[in-house]
């Protein structure tokens, strides 16, 4: 009975995301404050995008990379009301990223890095009716992608970040329950993590525990939009510059339609040779068994027949363009 109820709950949230509006509480959210006279220069030399282009009222996507250009974290970077910088990190990365940045502050740097993750909750609101439910709790107009709008829900300050699929709300962790309650009251349905993962994979979005890791570079994980090819030096730039200039991105994120569900980490093969690995896999109510994989070029191209070497045996599959 419990398994059936759980399945029904997951499907209900999934269906509501396609036809109405859902609310998803981001687990273990991360938020950093970066302040000081050298805050821009400090972040500029650590991440991939041009931080000097950051403007008030806008968010900038940028990637913290290692010397070999592997992904350490992905941020939405914003200007705080007091002029400092705020960085929304990947879930679960706030504390580790704060320590990493603090260890990279030089003695002459006039900058501080504070882990403020515990103070802020993050909630995603999306679905065809998302704009309607947000309007009903006082938002005049949903923000465009990368735009930021601030307003009060009752006496609770809320910031909404446009994501393209809906909004990410940043709310005091002490007051989030009341805001979620208001959203539920006007028709936004809570979404489970299981349903969120299915929707994420269907949309072809890389996830923090799967594709956005130090196994991959930003270009391999479809983060081209977070890279500036006109800015000065930053950690990992030489590798990324070679990938761009000489078309040396050896692997790319791809979608797979499968004959059966497979496990994360299973090898993707062509004629018995491993060309990639499964990074996310779900059973979609709309599409059946599907997966995301990082696959060597040119085998990532849509329409390529591949086999997935799962524990139970080889599973036939074909690559598809994203989103599904």
Where are these regions (language model features)?
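Acidic, proline/glycine-enriched N-terminal capping motif
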Residues: 1-72, 81
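Acidic, low-complexity central loop/insert segments
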Residues: 22-24, 30-31, 73-206
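Residue-level signal for inorganic ion chemistry
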Residues: 36, 87, 125-127, 169, ...
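Short Gly/aromatic-enriched secondary-structure transition segments
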Residues: 46-49, 183, 293
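Glycine-centered loop/turn motifs
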Residues: 56-59, 144-151, 204, 209, ...
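Short acidic/polar mixed-charge low-complexity motifs
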Residues: 70-71, 83, 156, 273-274, ...
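Anionic-ligand-binding alpha/beta catalytic cores of soluble enzymes and soluble regulatory domains
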Residues: 170-255
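Glycine-rich, small/acidic residue-mixed loop/short-helix segments
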Residues: 216, 221-237, 241-324
């Amino acid at each position: 009975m419990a398994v059936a109820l759980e399945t029904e709950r997951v499907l209900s949230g999934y269906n509501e995301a396609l036809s109405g509006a859902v609310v998803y509480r981001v687990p273990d959210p991360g938020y950093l404050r970066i302040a000081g006279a050298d805050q821009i220069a400090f972040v500029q030399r650590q991440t991939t995008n041009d931080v000097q282009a950051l403007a008030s009222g806008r968010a900038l996507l940028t990637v913290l990379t290692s010397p070999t250009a592997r992904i350490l974290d992905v941020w939405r970077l914003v200007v705080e009301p007091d002029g400092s910088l705020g960085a929304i990190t990947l879930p679960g990365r706030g504390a580790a990223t704060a320590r990493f940045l603090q260890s990279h502050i030089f003695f002459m740097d006039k900058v501080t890095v504070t882990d403020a993750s515990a103070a802020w909750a993050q909630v995603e609101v999306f679905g065809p009716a998302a704009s309607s439910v947000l309007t009903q709790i006082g938002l005049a107009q949903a923000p465009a992608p990368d735009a930021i709008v601030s307003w009060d829900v009752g006496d609770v300050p809320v910031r909404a970040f446009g994501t393209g699929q809906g909004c990410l709300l940043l709310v005091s962790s002490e007051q989030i329950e009341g805001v979620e309650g208001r959203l539920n009251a006007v028709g936004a349905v809570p979404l489970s993590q299981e349903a969120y993962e299915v929707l994420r994979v269907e949309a072809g979005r890389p996830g923090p525990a799967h594709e956005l890791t130090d196994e991959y570079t930003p270009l391999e994980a479809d983060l081209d939009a977070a890279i500036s090819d006109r800015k000065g030096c930053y950690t990992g730039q030489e590798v990324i510059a070679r990938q761009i200039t000489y078309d040396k991105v050896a692997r790319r994120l791809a979608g797979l339609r499968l004959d059966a569900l497979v496990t994360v980490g299973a090898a993707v093969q062509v004629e018995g040779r491993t060309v990639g690995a499964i990074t996310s896999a779900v059973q979609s109510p709309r599409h059946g068994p599907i997966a995301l994989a990082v696959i060597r070029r040119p085998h990532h191209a849509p329409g390529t027949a591949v086999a997935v070497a799962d524990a139970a045996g080889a599973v036939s599959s074909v690559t598809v363009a994203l989103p599904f």
